[in-house]
Amino acid sequence: MNPTLILAAFCLGIASATLTFDHSLEAQWTKWKAMHNRLYGMNEEGWRRAVWEKNMKMIELHNQEYREGKHSFTMAMNAFGDMTSEEFRQVMNGFQNRKPRKGKVFQEPLFYEAPRSVDWREKGYVTPVKNQGQCGSCWAFSATGALEGQMFRKTGRLISLSEQNLVDCSGPQGNEGCNGGLMDYAFQYVQDNGGLDSEESYPYEATEESCKYNPKYSVANDTGFVDIPKQEKALMKAVATVGPISVAIDAGHESFLFYKEGIYFEPDCSSEDMDHGVLVVGYGFESTESDNNKYWLVKNSWGEEWGMGGYVKMAKDRRNHCGIASAASYPTV
């Protein structure tokens, strides 16, 4: 596996005295700042606006090319508009692609033909979209999502689980709170600890604090975890037969940061260098089934305003696009 991803801060190198702005965007900039409660210091506002304008024009160009048939998805300005992609990766993406896998190996069911489409939201397996905030805890949200689904499968009750419990307490298993972690380490913590508290009893704070796990409020447990072979065919069978699956993807692209809707396909996406943990809750296709219109239905942890109500359709069966099948796993309960 690759060593821990080390992200460096990005230096804009823009002197405030030389900044020039597109005055036709003045009203949109003012509205965006108000919508997202942005208050800047005198020296910061200029270069933040420069970043925002650069992102806005990149989005407009992409959407124009979409209308010309050059892309399969649209983009939109969102809460990340004043951040560079380098800043965003440093703060938000927290999957650490570094260790050999130690779970049981998923055994594909023999003679099983997976359905053409699956959506576990329709079966009650999936909690509402959550928001990790400015904390590299994506791994915790991916892990709770998979465990929430398996607990529902076992008990018939869907209970939101505590990401904060994982952020604060799974350090001994190898996780690093807001600085990143692995879903398998989270599953290992739950097994070692003998339980995981509910979201209601141990709410999310978007910062690492001292461990406050209380067995009185534990509502989930697992007996280990299963790692899925690095093939989309195996992932498809796992999603169809097991439920929502934790996966990691390469999300380090502006196209993903500002994704709005459609099937996400990024030519520069890596199938090996993943930096973001998410949850596959199904798969399907748009219009008629063909090579370029199949997708994985993926739950993100950036709030409901991002993407399609917090979800993204990732290109499916296109050479393991963005590494979606490279680190897939789920807990056993």
From Swiss-Prot:
Coiled coil: none annotated. Optimum pH is 5.5, also active at pH 7.0 with CUX1 as substrate. The record marks F106, Q107, E108, Y112, E113, A114 as: Cleavage. Zn(2+) 2 binds at E163, E199. Residues 1-17 form the signal peptide. Its main location: other. It is found in: Lysosome; Apical cell membrane; Cytoplasmic vesicle, Secretory vesicle, Chromaffin granule; Secreted, Extracellular space. Zn(2+) 5 binds at D250, H253. One of its GO terms (molecular function) is collagen binding. Its EC number is 3.4.22.15. The keyword Signal applies. Pfam families: Inhibitor_I29, Peptidase_C1. The keyword Magnesium does not apply. Transmembrane segments: none annotated. Zn(2+) 7 binds at D275. During export along the endocytic pathway, pro-CTSL undergoes several proteolytic cleavages to generate the CTSL single-chain and two-chain mature forms, composed of a heavy chain linked to a light chain by disulfide bonds. Autocleavage; produces the single-chain CTSL after cleavage of the propeptide. The cleavage can be intermolecular. Zn(2+) 3 binds at D184, D227. The active site is at C138, H276, N300. InterPro entries: Papain-like_cys_pep_sf, Pept_asp_AS, Pept_cys_AS, Pept_his_AS, Peptidase_C1A, Peptidase_C1A_C, Peptidase_C1A_papain-like, Prot_inhib_I29. It is an enzyme of class 3 (hydrolase). Dimer of a heavy and a light chain linked by disulfide bonds. Interacts with Long isoform of CD74/Ii chain; the interaction stabilizes the conformation of mature CTSL. This is Procathepsin L.
